[in-house]
From Swiss-Prot:
GO biological process, one term: diaminopimelate biosynthetic process
Name of the protein: 4-hydroxy-tetrahydrodipicolinate synthase
Pfam families reported for this sequence: DHDPS (PF00701)
Record family assignment: Belongs to the DapA family.
Assembly and binders: Homotetramer; dimer of dimers.
Record keywords, A-Z: Amino-acid biosynthesis, Cytoplasm, Diaminopimelate biosynthesis, Lyase, Lysine biosynthesis, Schiff base
Site feature Part of a proton relay during catalysis, where: T44, Y107
The reaction(s) this protein catalyses: L-aspartate 4-semialdehyde + pyruvate = (2S,4S)-4-hydroxy-2,3,4,5-tetrahydrodipicolinate + H2O + H(+)
GO cellular component, one term: cytosol
Active site: Y133, K161
Stated role: Catalyzes the condensation of (S)-aspartate-beta-semialdehyde [(S)-ASA] and pyruvate to 4-hydroxy-tetrahydrodipicolinate (HTPA).
Membrane-spanning parts: none
SMART domains: DHDPS
High-level lineage: Bacteria, Pseudomonadati, Pseudomonadota, Gammaproteobacteria, Alteromonadales
Amino acid sequence: MFTGSYVALITPMYQSGEIDYPSLKKLVDFHIANGSHGLIAVGTTGESATLPFDEHIEVVKRMVEFADKKIPVIAGSGANSTAEAIFLSEQMAGTGIDGFLSVVPYYNKPQQKGMVAHFNAVADATDLPVLLYNVPGRTVADMLPDTVAELATHPKIVGLKDATGDIARLKQMQPLVDKDFVFLSGDDATGCEFLTAGGHGVISVTANVVPKQMSQMCEAALAGNYSKAKEIDQQIAELHSALFIEPNPVLPKWALYKMGLIQSAFLRLPLIESELDSQNHIEQVMRNSGVLS
């Protein structure tokens, strides 16, 4: 259902902190023109933690409007309160989105059975497909393979974004689920390896900056041309690491500002704009990768 390169899109903001919707449209157009296979609205990279519900929902609505059915839009709907996750999902269900991305509840460290109850409740509350999102580096709680397998039996839970970077875990999960269950990498550094091990796509931060290369890499891997996929991945490998020198999405925003795609690299507190050394480093990497001339 959801395969290829899905970009974990940033949420552009003016220096005042308000959402910059003209730049958001420019970004959506940029991804359509450069072959991205889908957009993730207001996930981790979209600063979901600092967008109140009304803004969160409005950004999703605008992205759907700008995408104009030319590219799928999946909305981040995760929360560490099951009631809030359900509320968000219900509010966004009628916006025209193609599905939800729902993260493992963070901070309160639910048990595995608690995760099962949480995600089943979220999926029961919608008619749209749900992607699970496991990112223990941010949430602390880790959704284990047997838990994924149990949740995969729910008819609305169609896949998993796995940001562990652990290819062995992917291989462990594959025989536990139906063949139609989708595995998407949430770790750019290991995304190509994930695809060659049988993954179906990526939800990528790097794709903010090089959408064409990421979509071409995915297309090559999914067609079985692993040598071409690895060749493309090597061309952008420096970007994979450079974009994460500071917490995401600090440097992706600065890179897009440098590319002229957004008007400001502003982030909402507690995130702040990148250090000069980081900016100089990623600018050089962008030149090395052909992003900047």
